[in-house]
């Protein structure tokens, strides 16, 4: 059933170049929406939309299932701060989870947190998701997403 899956990821901050962010979402019908806003050197916002095949959606679900992110809780994760924020929302089957934390610079930040095991799951899942999305956008539109 296609209506049992949704994913949205956001990472951003407000700084001297304004509101800079990366956001993408996969909708139940297979629509991938992507936005990348950087005002550095007067860059313009990149917005792209495309539909992905059912097999891509199935692979996305597999990546999420394998990560076991649905077993995690962000209560002990660093809260968003002046450096930035990350948000991950997933609906998969009858589960609806939402995480909010600060930007993570490296595994050092993960290891120094109050919940390194849980934050590590989040960190690696986000890396996998970004890699997949950048590949899909790059292949579909022949652009460099970052």
UniProtKB/Swiss-Prot annotation:
Q: Which gene encodes it?
A: MAGOH
Q: Which family does the UniProt entry place this protein in?
A: Belongs to the mago nashi family.
Tissues expressing this chain: Ubiquitous.
Q: Which GO terms describe its biological process?
A: mRNA export from nucleus; mRNA splicing, via spliceosome; nuclear-transcribed mRNA catabolic process, nonsense-mediated decay; regulation of alternative mRNA splicing, via spliceosome; regulation of mRNA processing; regulation of nuclear-transcribed mRNA catabolic process, nonsense-mediated decay; regulation of translation; RNA splicing
Residues modified as N-acetylmethionine are 1
Please provide, in alphabetical order, the Gene Ontology terms of the cellular component aspect for this entry. Answer: catalytic step 2 spliceosome; cytosol; exon-exon junction complex; exon-exon junction subcomplex mago-y14; nuclear speck; nucleoplasm; nucleus
Task: Give the top-rank taxon of the lineage listed in the UniProt record for this protein.
Answer: Eukaryota
Any one Pfam family here would be Mago_nashi
**Record-level Gene Ontology MF annotations:** RNA binding
Asked if the record carries the keyword Cytoplasm, the reply is yes
Q: Which CDD domains match?
A: Mago_nashi
| Keyword Transcription applies | no
Q: What is this protein called?
A: Protein mago nashi homolog
What biological function has been recorded for the protein in this entry?
Required for pre-mRNA splicing as component of the spliceosome. Plays a redundant role with MAGOHB as core component of the exon junction complex (EJC) and in the nonsense-mediated decay (NMD) pathway. The EJC is a dynamic structure consisting of core proteins and several peripheral nuclear and cytoplasmic associated factors that join the complex only transiently either during EJC assembly or during subsequent mRNA metabolism.
Q: Where located?
A: Nucleus; Nucleus speckle; Cytoplasm
Q: Where is the signal peptide?
A: none
Main location (coarse class): nucleus
Which proteins does it associate with, and in what oligomeric form?
Answer: Heterodimer with RBM8A. Core component of the mRNA splicing-dependent exon junction complex (EJC); the core complex contains CASC3, EIF4A3, MAGOH or MAGOHB, and RBM8A. Component of the ALYREF/THOC4-EJC-RNA complex; in the complex interacts with EIF4A3, RBM8A and THOC4 (via the RRM domain); these interactions are likely specific to RNA-bound EJC. Interacts with PYM1; the interaction is direct and dissociates the EJC from spliced mRNAs. Identified in a complex composed of the EJC core, UPF3B and UPF2. The EJC core can also interact with UPF3A (in vitro). Identified in the spliceosome C complex.
- Spell out the SUPFAM superfamilies in the cross-references: Mago nashi protein (SSF89817)
Which chain positions lie within coiled-coil regions?
A: none
Family matches, as InterPro entries:
Mago_nashi, Mago_nashi_sf
Q: Disulphide bridges in this chain?
A: none
User: Which keywords, in A-to-Z order, does the entry hold?
Assistant: Acetylation, Cytoplasm, mRNA processing, mRNA splicing, mRNA transport, Nonsense-mediated mRNA decay, Nucleus, RNA-binding, Spliceosome, Translation regulation, Transport
């Amino acid at each position: 059933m296609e209506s049992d899956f949704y994913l949205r990821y956001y990472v951003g901050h407000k700084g001297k170049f304004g509101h800079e962010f990366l956001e993408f979402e996969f909708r139940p019908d297979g629509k991938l929406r992507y936005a990348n806003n950087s005002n550095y050197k007067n860059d313009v916002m990149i917005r792209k939309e495309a539909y992905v095949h059912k097999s891509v959606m199935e692979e996305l679900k597999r990546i999420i299932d394998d990560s076991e992110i649905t077993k995690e809780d962000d209560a002990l994760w660093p809260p968003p701060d002046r450096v930035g924020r990350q948000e991950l929302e997933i609906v998969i089957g009858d589960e609806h989870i939402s995480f909010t934390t600060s930007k993570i610079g490296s595994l050092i930040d993960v290891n120094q947190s109050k919940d390194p095991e849980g934050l590590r799951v989040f960190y690696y899942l986000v890396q996998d998701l970004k890699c997949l999305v950048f590949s899909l956008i790059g292949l579909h539109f022949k652009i460099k997403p970052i």
